[in-house]
Amino acid sequence: MRAVVQRVSRGEVSVGGEMVSSIGKGFVVLVGISIDDNENDVMYMADKIVNLRVFEDEEGKMNLSLLDIGGEVLLVSQFTLLGDVRKGRRPNFMMAQKPQEALKYFNLLVKEIEKRGVSVKTGIFQAMMKVLIENDGPVTILIDSKKVF
């Protein structure tokens, strides 16, 4: 499981010109689910997202988590994060999970983040979305549950 975590002052998802989800301060998380992901990857990712300390404390130091600031998550499925461009010029998406299985893990990730005390909004799975990301910083963190980077 791979995620791009962006600290935001706000985020929105629109489908077909209509806003379907929005958050204030927190994270917009773009997540790609791999063919070899399982529940352990979901738990790892949920813990990292909820406890990542990238919000500034009273001294300006990145020391606070979503839990500490009462932040929200806008979780957006993005299979293209699994694209392999090592060969050729067109991405190979062979490592991306099939949609039905990916949706199962995506929904589990939503539940696990919420279970840890953070509000989660989502885009619409498999829809063509417009994602508004108002970066705060900017602060962008890459997380891979297989610890590839």
Curated annotation (Swiss-Prot):
Sequence motif Gly-cisPro motif, important for rejection of L-amino acids, location on chain: 137-138
Pfam family, one: Tyr_Deacylase
Record keywords: Cytoplasm, Hydrolase, RNA-binding, tRNA-binding
EC nos: 3.1.1.96
Gene Ontology annotations of biological process type: D-amino acid catabolic process
GO CC annotation: cytoplasm
Lineage top rank: taxon: Bacteria
Keyword Hydrolase in annotation: yes
Compartmental location: Cytoplasm
GO molecular function ontology, one term from the record: D-tyrosyl-tRNA(Tyr) deacylase activity
Catalytic activity, as annotated: glycyl-tRNA(Ala) + H2O = tRNA(Ala) + glycine + H(+); a D-aminoacyl-tRNA + H2O = a tRNA + a D-alpha-amino acid + H(+)
Described purpose of this protein according to its UniProt entry: An aminoacyl-tRNA editing enzyme that deacylates mischarged D-aminoacyl-tRNAs. Also deacylates mischarged glycyl-tRNA(Ala), protecting cells against glycine mischarging by AlaRS. Acts via tRNA-based rather than protein-based catalysis; rejects L-amino acids rather than detecting D-amino acids in the active site. By recycling D-aminoacyl-tRNA to D-amino acids and free tRNA molecules, this enzyme counteracts the toxicity associated with the formation of D-aminoacyl-tRNA entities in vivo and helps enforce protein L-homochirality.
Domain notes: A Gly-cisPro motif from one monomer fits into the active site of the other monomer to allow specific chiral rejection of L-amino acids.
Family according to the record: Belongs to the DTD family.
Subunit and interaction comment: Homodimer.
Name listed for the protein in its UniProt record: D-aminoacyl-tRNA deacylase
Native source organism of the sequence: Thermoanaerobacter pseudethanolicus (strain ATCC 33223 / 39E) (Clostridium thermohydrosulfuricum)
Protein's gene: dtd
